């Protein structure tokens, strides 16, 4: 979800003035290219369409495979007994079942070996077998295993994103007001956890005759916006959408709602997605960016 900042960086400085002045030919081409890159991200192995499961991993032994006796059940295409995770505190090992070929980060492994755990939402070591990949991550003592599948039903049935028509009226310049010190935001996610993020300031802008305000969080050298509006739960995803921008320059930020996109949770029920804070609910319809096809 915080992954697309590079998609707008290359052309943003050159195109900003042309966009705001209404150079639609260049702008339409840019949006088209952005959407192609976005679609490629969704279909990639790190995207949401490969994800088919998220499981808690308690202390002790957790067996993995397609057999109904396994703690974590995989699709029937997987081996009946892939192996077992052994967790003792923050020490995690994996022992494959004899005869099952597994790789860790692309390297063949055998016998019992340690697994590096990532910090949510970033996974640790990638364990591969057949069409499947599993990885372990942890946060506040909670360990979770994600399962990815090259033949995921979400990937096979994905028809591409739906979009509002490109509209330069939703390309706006906002005034950025920095906070004296970054403000801590408590951001809940769709798995029930709450994370603390830093808001460097807020932005105000005019849209559809309204003066609106959003509070972003800092990501890298840019800003990340989580928002809802009056299309949420109707034409767009009910939990809200995301938007990224460059960092403020001369007290201004360009917001391009034609690049508003859905959280990963819009594509499968297993992703962990931050939920927009209440103050980021806009009292207008943002008829720009990605729509929601439905499905879960």
Q: What annotation goes with each model-predicted range?
A:
Residues 106-119, 211-259:
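An exposed acidic His-Trp-rich patch
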Residues 175-231, 237:
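Flexible, glycine-rich surface segments
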Residues 83-87, 132-138, 174, 212-216:
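Broad, structure-driven detector of short, well-ordered beta-strand segments within folded domains
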Residues 1-12:
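N-terminal secretory signal peptides and thylakoid transit peptides that target proteins
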Residues 51, 56-124:
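Forkhead-associated
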Residues 160, 230-235, 246, 252-296:
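Extended, aromatic/histidine-rich regions of cofactor-dependent oxidoreductases associated
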Residues 21-55:
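N-terminal pre-domain segments of enzymes
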């Amino acid at each position: 979800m915080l992954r697309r900042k590079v998609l707008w960086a290359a052309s943003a400085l050159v195109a900003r003035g042309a966009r705001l002045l209404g150079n639609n030919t260049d702008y339409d081409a840019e949006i088209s290219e952005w959407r192609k890159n976005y679609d490629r991200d969704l279909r990639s192995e790190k995207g949401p369409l490969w994800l088919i499961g998220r499981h808690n991993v308690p202390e002790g032994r957790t067996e993995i495979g397609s057999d109904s006796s396994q703690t974590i059940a995989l699709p029937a295409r997987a081996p009946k007994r892939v192996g077992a995770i052994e967790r003792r505190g923050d020490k995690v090992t994996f022992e494959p079942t004899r005869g099952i070929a597994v790789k860790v980060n692309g390297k063949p492994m055998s016998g019992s070996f340690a697994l590096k755990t990532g910090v949510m939402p970033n996974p640790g070591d990638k364990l591969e077998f057949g069409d499947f990949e599993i990885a372990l991550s942890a946060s506040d003592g909670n360990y979770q295993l994600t399962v990815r599948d090259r033949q995921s039903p979400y990937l096979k049935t994905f028809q591409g994103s739906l979009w509002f028509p490109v509209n330069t009226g939703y390309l706006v310049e906002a005034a950025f007001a920095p906070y004296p010190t970054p403000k801590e935001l408590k951001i809940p996610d769709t798995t029930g956890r709450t994370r603390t993020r830093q808001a460097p300031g807020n932005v105000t802008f005019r849209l559809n005759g309204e003066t609106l305000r959003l509070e972003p969080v800092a990501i890298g050298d840019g800003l990340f916006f989580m928002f809802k509006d009056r299309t949420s739960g109707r034409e767009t995803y009910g939990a809200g959408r995301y938007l990224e921008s460059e960092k403020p320059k001369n007290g201004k930020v360009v917001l391009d709602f034609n690049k508003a996109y859905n959280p990963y949770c819009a594509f499968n029920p297993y992703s962990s997605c931050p939920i927009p804070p209440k103050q980021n609910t806009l009292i207008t319809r943002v008829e720009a960016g990605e729509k929601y096809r439905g499905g879960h």
